[in-house]
Amino acid sequence: MKKSVLSIIGALFLIVGATTAFGDHHGGSKIAPKTVIHVVTLTWKDDASDEQIKKALDGVKTIAKKLDGVTRVWTRAIKTQGDHGHAFVMEFADEQALKDYAGSDAQKEWYKVYLPIRARSTTFDITN
């Protein structure tokens, strides 16, 4: 399981790195941004329906619309390993934005659809 989580995180770093490198080549973003990425790998409960899973992942996008500090989200895992069959990423403007998200009304509302179908998850918060 540790290997699969590290593989997913490695892939996410490649994606973020490629995006950053492309932006820098064109005079865009900094090499080491101060944004925070909130990486969550997860396994759904066996009885979670496709509709419930879709609603939970769509909820990640809804959070981004409700909170100014969320700059981007990713909800479609292209490749996963081990028993963590899904992942999502939220990018926050800075560490304060991540702190503002924790315990927010938007998070609490989303938890109503997410937590009942989540079997387990692993979270990493990463910045420079």
Predicted feature locations:
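Bacterial N-terminal signal peptides that target proteins for export
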Residues: 1-9
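Short, exposed beta-strand-loop hairpins at the edges of beta-sheets
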Residues: 99-102, 109-115
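C-terminal partner/receptor-binding element of secreted or periplasmic proteins
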Residues: 115-124, 128
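Low-complexity intrinsically disordered segments
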Residues: 1, 16-17
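Short S/T/G/P-rich N-terminal loop/turn motif that feeds into the first structured element of a domain
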Residues: 7, 17-86, 93-100, 126-128
